[in-house]
Amino acid sequence: MKPLIALVGRPNVGKSTLFNRILREKAAIVDPTPGVTRDRHIAEGHWQGREFRLMDTGGYAPEDGVISTAMLEQTMMAIQDADIIIFLADVRSGVSYDDLELAKILKRDFSDKPIFLAVNKAESPQLAIEAASFVSTGFTEPWAISARDGSGVADLLDEILLTFPESDGPPEEDGAIRLAVIGRPNVGKSSFVNALLGSNRQIVSSIPGTTRDAIDTRFTRKQQEFMLIDTAGLRKRTKISAGIEYYSSLRSERAIERCEVAIVMLDATPGIEKQDLKIINIAAERKRGVLLLVNKWDLVEKDSKTSKQYEESLRSHMGNLSYIPVIFTSALTKKNLYRAIDTAKEISQNRSRKISTSALNRFLEEALAANHPSTRTGKELKIKYMTQIEAPWPVFAFFCNNPELVQTNFRKFLENKLREKFSLEGVTISLRFMQK
């Protein structure tokens, strides 16, 4: 197992900047506004040939208020999970009460873990000297660094490396199914993840957009490992201000790129909106498996026909995406929670299904007998055979006399029949017609 390093400290001391410096990429949201990184974010990094996991956290800020209290809880959870702790402070602000309180907790409750006090923003020799004043926290070796320009960071990482186990062990086969939980803000994505895991992994509140960054969490069900990515939601472009919310939206789209199956969450109470359809389309265009999860179903007044009518209305709006399965759930009551995960697993299996050429050509023979293709020009379309092309999603090649003779309705007929015959529910199918 790769060692887990946690970055902890009060808000705005530069944790996200150091996180990005160590990983050499803009993996966490960085903004001068205190409290921007409000949850835990984990990514993999490496130094001097050794691999590790790095965790960025919300700031330690023991104040009243919904977000600040939740951030404190998340910081404590991060410290408990970590193998190594980087306690980050700000030399320009000096030693604060919050620094002393966090230092007291670290020394009292986590003395069994390697803890490194890094005093950030020491961009000049004078500031580096002033970092020595942080011995008052009880940590006798403060490291003067600048996450902004990188000074001192390499030396800090070299020292941290000495606490690593001698070997990372044999490489593990990662058979986890990657699921991205996406949707408009405040539809219940974090509540869904928390209900599923039975742990307050995400900060959850009624304030839209509480989960600003993408958080990866692993869990196992029926001996199958999953990686859940809970995102901040894809905002309407016109509602995204320059800065944090815009970047969060981009991160959500990146989460789609990383996943195999996108679980698109809808809020049952207002019904489907244009932004919901746009999110579904983004996932389908990226050739990901898609599952629609209609959340807050417990809030809808219903009878025996309500779910059927709702699904029919939903599919009428989806057009060509009606192949996507729909599940009604409630993160609050946990209705159909595990059914959703089991269905996502089936979709992942459908997406990676390999079908033999002989089975495909038997299918083609039956399909052509049922619906011989017609053309506008009067010329005959002759399809000789078909095969599956190697790809992360189902791609089928049809070899014919003239690809330009293939009409849209016949293409759609073949796609529907392929789904029906080979159980390809929830996945995008690509058909390619090639001349031969």
Swiss-Prot record:
Protein's GO biological process: ribosome biogenesis
Binding site for GTP 2: 183-190, 230-234, 295-298
PROSITE patterns: G_ENGA
Entries under InterPro entries matching the protein: G_ENGA (IPR031166), GTP-bd (IPR006073), GTPase_Der (IPR016484), KH_dom-like (IPR032859), KH_dom-like_a/b (IPR015946), P-loop_NTPase (IPR027417), Small_GTP-bd (IPR005225)
Domain named KH-like: residues: 353-436
Keyword GTP-binding set for record: yes
Top-level taxon in the UniProt lineage: Bacteria
Keywords: GTP-binding, Nucleotide-binding, Repeat, Ribosome biogenesis
GO molecular function: GTP binding; ribosome binding
Binding site residues for GTP 1: 9-16, 56-60, 120-123
A Pfam cross-reference name: KH_dom-like
The EngA-type G domain, residue ranges: 3-168, 177-352
Quaternary assembly: Associates with the 50S ribosomal subunit.
Record family assignment: Belongs to the TRAFAC class TrmE-Era-EngA-EngB-Septin-like GTPase superfamily. EngA (Der) GTPase family.
HAMAP family named among the record's database cross-references: GTPase_Der
NCBIfam families: GTPase_EngA, small_GTP
Function text: GTPase that plays an essential role in the late steps of ribosome biogenesis.
The protein's name in its UniProt record: GTPase Der
The species this protein was found in: Chlorobium luteolum (strain DSM 273 / BCRC 81028 / 2530)
